Curated annotation (Swiss-Prot):
Name of the featured protein: Error-prone DNA polymerase
Biased composition (Basic and acidic residues): 1055-1066
UniProt-listed SMART domains: POLIIIAc
Record keywords: Cytoplasm, DNA damage, DNA repair, DNA replication, DNA-directed DNA polymerase, Nucleotidyltransferase, Transferase
Species of the source: Allorhizobium ampelinum (strain ATCC BAA-846 / DSM 112012 / S4) (Agrobacterium vitis (strain S4))
Lineage: Bacteria, Pseudomonadati, Pseudomonadota, Alphaproteobacteria, Hyphomicrobiales
Cellular component, GO annotation: cytoplasm
Length: 1097
């Protein structure tokens, strides 16, 4: 018997389904099920994944959706044709618009309005009066397309229930159909389904009760089993295929139409595009258009015309033109930088002719895929661009793509552990030991946490967390991928409101959009463009230079000298540990060297074994051999090594006779060969083509294996060139205007690889004076202040650095300051009108010290005398005057001042950095007694020397291409040190590596030229050494212990024999939990003030 399962829920019914579409379709194929009806709840979010699973397995997909109505009815709806699908998409959009994010509010009347062409199956519970009313309504709304589901509930009298439902359906002339209400593909997923139910209901497995499924039968069954379970309802079983035949709609029928763009009156989109291209040519080529470039432009315009992509190019041109008119810095990147048309229109900044790029990497007639132009904008002003797009195209025709937020290791551990009732501290210990979402949950990791790996609930947590990894958690918002349409967008896909105001998103992500060949425009945010925009503004204001990206001096020697020394902290793209390690070896001296530098520290070139051959050839340690002049023409710039995706494509085209489209298909097949194996069909063509053109079989095989090794991660040369432009510009500014660069970078946070503490530390190391936050001099942003009568400038930290302070209060402070500086805390409070809580935040940041010379505790004491409550009119002045007199008559209080160490802790806790001594400086005497050297001593030691050094952990990085190697950067008062932790040591000391704030490392120095690393052999967690830091001054005596007991107090307290007698007038201020209500307590343990290390995965 042929059978289709029409009620299947995938894991895109978030936290309901426990299996993916591909798992369900593969299982259906193995069981002999003809078709699957995917009916995720109130959503079509997973339907494209189901389409791809259907394509892969050959099992027919019936597009559907389960609608849960406000009156309690649940109806499975299936569009029978294309217009019915559009009505379904609009119906879901209507419900999402009413319900907001993650909710859908629909009534039966809505279905009646949009229901033409929809087939409906009522999902009943009992054959009662409610069901009778619902059946009558179903017959009225759906007519001949109305059905009633017969589904086992595995409860007492189940067969009687089915019999009554069948009779009731006959009475209302509604046909019955068998469904199985599938939630997972095989019985083993039952436990995971229970867990996601607990997560959804925010409860535990012990208390979830009847919210969980009452039976384990919610998996796919073969037709024979369904026939055995429903022996009396064979006609209802056969109707499953009847419904499949009636629902002829396929997602393949969706035809996407890009909106018409004809900016020039009375011209078509193609004519408008050509008009603007030739109009912009003199701006890019004032000396005249080179003949080769003219040929490239004509070739591109011809291909754009054939593929009907002119409206897309005009849209991107319009967006970029709007941004430039508003002074918003922007630049195109990605494969679009291969296009001469994009370059001439100002969308990208890379001349394809000069850089010998490849247009087929961007647009190919054989590939027949929509182009993809990524444009980066200043991240603080991108919203202006997004709202312009909505206003220009209309919200009914424009929306952002979704992103699928999936479970990773830590999130899976947390949610599963909570669902299974594990204690919070145990969940935290387990999740903190996870680095990435790979299978890092071995018994060894559990034992390292002193846990019992044989504990059943703990073992089950790890097993179920592994099953949950990769499952979708909810839909998020794409950073800027817009889908624009000619007609209504909700005819193609449901739209829902975003959590962000004035935004809306479709239910599909970029992969879904690409699978259906929709075109999208990527309006992305780049923090470094914000930084560079602020750099240029500060240079114009303080240096008198009118600088921009196009006017920066090219091939500046001083800039490249700085880059070669890996002095690139805070710059773009070449600031990571791996990039810094490569810079002294590659020694970039030209712009193209920088393009190579950006691209070479990537998984692709590393896995393809291309990095070391390139470096050896660059250092003249290995000869470069080109078997033919054609290969030299292709790979000459990269010394015979195909570092870029375009290089691989050119090798295929020039050496093996591939067309441009075939070469791009080769690139795509290499990118997915691990999953599809499609690369094998190109191997024979490439190898035989190269042999036919005179290459040896051995060389051809070697070439293919290299391309295969890096294809899945290869970097486009056009993309690298676009990023190299910004990388060079940021390094140029850092080299020649370090004060400006520091201020702009701080004003653009959060962004980049390093925290403000490291940015400020690096600026000071370059001779930049950095001044603290000041209530009388700081604005919201960091500013530049002239140093005396010189042309030098110091950086004044802005109030944006103060944690907990809002921009509105800062604006009031700055406005009040226009009438003169504040001379006291009370004066500032009266004139600015900011609440006392904001003054407390400024006091914690020590912002009163620079101009008013008031210490933190003195300010906090003064703030306690202020009143936020408004006083009655007329009585206000008199009452305030009396209070002031009383306060003036109050005896002066001498507060015990904070230690230097406590001030450092407070600095880190409230502004994220300190301009005082480094925290490790307070521990140096103790560390020296343990033979722990400074980071500077370690990094200047000879090669092979064994040392032990310690510092605060700044950055942890574990690149996917590094084969499990962990790179750590630590810092002490002398500077940073670079640590390499091999996989064996990482697994052995995982808790220390991932959990410590301060670490000591014993290891051996490794030098390769100017690149220095400390190869770790032993690791020690010194975080506890920081706990008493707040009690210390630079000169202090370590507490002396007496055996196993403490001397009259808490750990970390001083030796009572060294204490001086108390002064008679010392006032001890009571400790208060709420910071804004009292003075800082004397810390017995250090608060978690230091910024957490930045982890890069």
């Amino acid at each position: 018997m042929r059978y289709a399962e029409l009620q299947v829920t995938t894991h895109f019914s978030f936290l309901r389904g426990a299996s993916s579409a591909i798992e369900l379709f593969e299982t259906a194929k193995s069981l002999g099920i003809d078709a699957i009806g995917v009916v995720d709840r109130n959503s079509l979010a997973g339907i494209v994944r189901a389409l791809e699973a259907s394509r892969a397995t050959g099992v027919r997909l019936v597009v559907g959706c389960r609608l849960d109505l406000q009156d309690g009815m649940s109806i499975l709806v299936y569009p029978t044709d294309r217009t019915a699908y559009s009505r379904l998409a609009r119906l879901i959009t209507l419900g999402k618009g009413r319900g907001g994010k993650d909710n859908c509010i629909l009534m039966l009347d809505d279905i009646a309005q949009y229901g033409e062409g929809l087939l409906g199956i009522l999902v009943p519970d009992l054959a009662d009066d409610t069901c009778a009313v619902q059946l009558r309504k179903m017959a009225e709304v759906f007519g001949d397309l109305a059905y009633l589901s017969l589904c086992l509930r595995r409860r007492p009298n189940d067969q009687l229930r089915l019999h009554e439902l069948s009779n009731m359906a006959t009475r209302f002339k509604v046909k019955t159909v068998v469904t199985n209400d599938v939630l997972f593909h095989e019985p083993g997923r039952r436990q995971l389904q229970d867990i996601v139910t607990c997560i959804r209901n925010n409860t535990t497995i012990d208390t979830v009760g009847f919210e969980r499924e009452r039976h384990a039968d919610r998996y796919l069954k073969p037709p024979e089993e369904m026939e055995r379970l429903f022996p009396r309802y064979r006609q209802a079983l056969r109707r499953t295929m009847e419904i499949v035949d009636r629902c002829k709609f396929s997602l393949e029928e969706l035809t996407y139409q890009y909106p018409e763009e004809a900016i020039v009156p009375r011209k078509t989109a193609q004519e408008s595009l050509e008009h603007y291209v030739w109009q912009c040519v003199p701006d890019r080529y004032p000396q005249g258009l080179p003949p080769k470039t003219l040929q490239i432009i004509r070739h591109e315009l011809d291909l754009i015309h054939k593929m009907k992509y002119a409206p897309y190019f005009l849209t991107v041109f319009s967006i970029v033109r709007f941004a430039r008119a508003k002074g918003i810095l922007c630049q195109g990147r990605g494969s679009a930088a291969n296009s001469a048309v994009c370059y001439i229109l100002g969308v990208t900044s890379i001349d394809p002719e000069t850089n010998n790029l490849l247009f087929e990497r961007f647009v190919s007639q054989e590939r027949d895929e929509p182009p993809d132009i990524d444009v980066d904008f200043e991240h603080e002003r991108r919203e202006e661009v997004i709202q312009w797009i909505y206003k220009t195209y209309g919200k009914e025709k424009a929306a952002l793509c979704a992103t699928v937020n999936r479970y990773r290791a830590k999130g899976a551990i947390r949610d599963v552990g909570k669902a299974l009732g594990l204690p919070e501290d145990l969940i935290k210990a387990l999740s903190s030991g996870m680095w990435s979402w790979s299978q890092e949950t071995s018994d060894r990791n559990v034992r390292e946490l002193n846990l019992n790996p044989d504990d059943r609930r703990l073992t089950l947590t790890l097993q179920l967390a592994q099953q949950l990894m990769g499952a979708p958690r909810h839909l998020g918002q794409h950073p800027g991928g817009f889908v624009l349409t000619h007609d209504r967008l909700d005819d193609l896909v449901p739209i829902e409101p975003s959590t962000m105001e004035d935004r809306q998103i479709i239910e599909w992500d970029k992969d879904d959009v690409e699978a259906l060949k929709f075109m999208k425009v990527d309006v992305l945010a780049l923090g470094m463009l914000t930084c560079m925009s602020k750099v240029f503004a500060l240079i114009r204001e303080h240096k008198g230079d009118d600088l921009d990206l196009a006017k920066i001096r090219q091939e500046d020697k001083a800039t490249y000298e700085m880059i070669c020394k890996a002095d690139t902290l805070g710059t773009f793209q070449i600031e990571s540990r791996a990039q810094m390690a490569m810079l002294p070896r590659l020694k970039p001296k030209t712009f193209y060297d920088l393009v190579v530098q950006v691209a070479i520290v990537r998984p692709g070139p590393i896995q393809g074994d291309m990095v070391h051959p390139y470096l050896r050839r660059r250092e003249k340690k290995e000869d470069v051999d080109y078997p033919t002049p054609e290969l030299e023409a292709v790979l000459g710039k990269t010394l015979g090594v195909p570092l870029f995706q375009e290089s691989a494509m050119r090798v295929a085209m020039v050496c093996a006779g591939f067309t441009g489209g075939e070469a791009d298909q080769l690139r795509k097949s290499m990118a997915t060969f691990k999953f599809t194996g499609g690369v094998s069909r190109f191997k024979e063509k490439l190898v035989s083509g190269m042999v036919k053109n005179g290459y040896t079989p051995e060389f051809a095989e070697k070439t293919f294996s290299r391309l295969e090794g890096f294809g899945s991660y290869g970097f486009p040369e056009s993309h690298a060139a676009s990023f190299a432009l910004i990388a060079y510009a940021s390094n140029y500014v850092k080299c020649h205007f370090p004060d400006v660069f520091c201020a702009a970078l701080l004003n653009s946070q959060p962004m980049g690889f390093y925290a403000p503490a490291q940015i400020v530390g690096d600026a000071r190391a370059h001779g930049v004076e950095v001044r603290p936050v000041c209530v009388n001099r700081s604005r919201w942003d960091c500013t530049l202040e002239r140093i005396g009568t010189t042309q030098q400038h110091a950086v004044r930290l802005g109030m944006r650095m103060v944690k907990g302070l809002v921009v509105a209060d800062v604006a009031r402070i700055v406005a009040a300051r226009m009438n003169g500086p504040f001379d006291s805390v009370d004066d500032m409070w009266r004139r600015s009108g900011v609440p006392a809580a904001s003054l407390v935040e400024l006091a914690h940041a020590d912002a009163f010290q620079p101009s008013l010379k008031l210490a933190r505790r003195d300010v906090l004491w003064a703030i306690k005398a202020l009143r936020d409550e408004p006083l009655p009119l007329f009585a206000a002045a008199a009452e305030r005057e009396m209070k002031t007199i009383a306060e003036q008559n109050e005896p002066e209080v001498e507060l015990r001042q904070m230690t230097k160490g406590h001030n450092v802790v407070e600095d880190y806790g409230h502004i994220g950095l300190t301009l005082r001594d480094h925290p490790i400086a307070f521990l140096r005497t103790d560390l020296a007694k343990r033979n722990i050297v400074t980071c500077e001593e370690a990094m200047t030691a000879r090669d092979g020397r064994w040392v032990i050094t310690a510092g605060l952990v700044l950055v942890r990085q574990k690149p996917g291409s590094a084969k499990g190697v962990m790179f750590i950067t630590i810092e002490d008062e002398t500077g940073p040190a670079n640590i390499v932790v091999w996989p064996k040591l990482f697994e052995k000391r995982r808790r220390i590596v991932l959990g410590s704030s301060m670490m000591a490392i014993h290891g051996r120095i490794q030098r390769e030229g100017e690149v220095v690393h400390l190869i770790a052999q032993q690791l020690f967690d010194l975080t506890s050494d920081l706990s008493g830091l707040a009690d210390r001054d630079m000169e202090f005596k370590l507490p002396t212990g007496r055996g196993d007991e403490f001397a009259h107090g808490s750990p970390g307290g001083g030796d009572s024999r060294d204490r001086s007698p108390p002064k008679p007038r010392d006032i001890v201020v009571p400790l208060c939990r709420a910071r804004h209500k009292g003075i800082d307590p004397e810390p017995e343990t250090m608060p978690s003030a230091f910024p957490k290390p930045r982890d890069f995965r």
